Amino acid sequence: MIPGELLIGPGEHPLNTGRRTKTLLVRNTGDRPIQVGSHYHFAETNQALDFDRAAARGMRLNIASGTAVRFEPGQERTVELLDYAGARLVFGFQGRVQGAP
């Protein structure tokens, strides 16, 4: 085994089952590409991304860990968000939430 290697059995392995999801339309109003990582608190992303930020509180992108979504200038796309697990207390990022529900 190689350090960090994962040995996964055959078959499908669904991720994030049973967790609440939400779909939002997002548009990059800026003049530069914006990339958002898998676990970034979506409500606190770059202000050039135009979407319903209140609806995104306590949520992250529903994509595989370690991956990201890139928004090109002027691009509009639909994303699926997923509730954070556990106590759902969010700290850091841009400091807008700091644990508030």
Curated annotation (Swiss-Prot):
Domain of life assignment: Bacteria
The keyword Transcription is assigned to this record: no
Single GO MF descriptor: urease activity
GO biological process: urea catabolic process
The EC number(s) this enzyme carries: 3.5.1.5
Keyword Zinc belongs to the record: no
Name of the protein: Urease subunit beta
Gene3D superfamilies per record: Urease, beta subunit
HAMAP family the UniProt entry points to: Urease_beta (MF_01954)
Pfam families: Urease_beta (PF00699)
Subunit architecture: Heterotrimer of UreA (gamma), UreB (beta) and UreC (alpha) subunits. Three heterotrimers associate to form the active enzyme.
Species annotation: Verminephrobacter eiseniae (strain EF01-2)
